[in-house]
Amino acid sequence: MDEEPERTKRWEGGYERTWEILKEDESGSLKATIEDILFKAKRKRVFEHHGQVRLGMMRHLYVVVDGSRTMEDQDLKPNRLTCTLKLLEYFVEEYFDQNPISQIGIIVTKSKRAEKLTELSGNPRKHITSLKKAVDMTCHGEPSLYNSLSMAMQTLKHMPGHTSREVLIIFSSLTTCDPSNIYDLIKSLKAAKIRVSIIGLSAEVRVCTALARETGGTYHVILDESHYKELLTHHVSPPPASSNSECSLIRMGFPQHTIASLSDQDAKPSFSMAHLDSNTEPGLTLGGYFCPQCRAKYCELPVECKICGLTLVSAPHLARSYHHLFPLDAFQEIPLEEHNGERFCYACQGELKDQHVYVCSVCQNVFCVDCDVFVHDSLHCCPGCIHKIPVPSGI
């Protein structure tokens, strides 16, 4: 009984004696402390990369969304469901920006069942449209982890061995209603090399801990909305690939976009293979991307040809995936007083006013904290190093 008060307070540890963090400066202001907290938050993600490790570049990810009655709770505003769907819209955009040759699918579980909101696809607009429509979804019943994971596994287990197979579960409930022993399913997921990660919205659940541990995934419980967004962002970058996963050359096609007009006598309207699966899209169109192997037409890339199975991509898609393999090294942090050069950021040309500046170890150019974060999060290459590369004389 003596341990009970201590155990009930343990989750509140991050909020104990918070006044000790705040320190006044000589003028009695707390501005310096607040700026330091914001600065550390900005710099945190710069160091969160895997380094020189093997990554699963071609990803197949199913996102399982809890649609049970607990999603109507209002601890996230306006409620858990609306907040989750908004954050997932942001996640889908970031996911395809950083993983353009990957695919994603969405599953909703409620009333002890699981149903697909979207199939595995590389089209972000399709997923975002479905997420916007799901705001009006009614939340009721209990979720079923077993049915959701079974549905995801039925598709993922047929994916090629050189791709990563992942499931991300947004779990709000503290219970799951399953038709069979979920621990047997966990063994099947592990055998199929499917990595399952969970983001909990309520509290830690034992079966989720076992699920993440056995499949090599992660399990976190959110603190607030900003922490929720941060946890989702962690799943944007590709995870390290297992050492025994297949490694082989992949055939890819690079179709050029053909533009045709009605005035062109040789132009012939044709069906897009993507339109054949949808009744809402127009049928016959001019131009598009034509598979170099079988000449099947598609309206956008990347896509896997439904006729010959060739992966169709563009060169920028591969370039945007390449930076994960060789992440930019973190810039060296030095106090502003120790910097003897110009007091201007090399990237934005703004005056350096922060207490610390950041120096590229290769080109020795200096950056402010905002440009440092932008370079590592979005640009993925140092502007100073690029400008030092000599341009061929023939160009």
UniProtKB/Swiss-Prot annotation:
Zn-finger region bounds: C4-type: 291-308
Record keyword Nucleus present: yes
Cellular component annotations (GO), alphabetically ordered: core TFIIH complex portion of holo TFIIH complex; nucleus; transcription factor TFIIH holo complex
Keywords, sorted A to Z: DNA damage, DNA repair, Metal-binding, Nucleus, Phosphoprotein, Transcription, Transcription regulation, Zinc, Zinc-finger
Annotated compartments: Nucleus
One Pfam family of this chain: C1_4
One GO MF term: zinc ion binding
Family: Belongs to the GTF2H2 family.
Protein name: General transcription factor IIH subunit 2
Organism: Bos taurus (Bovine)
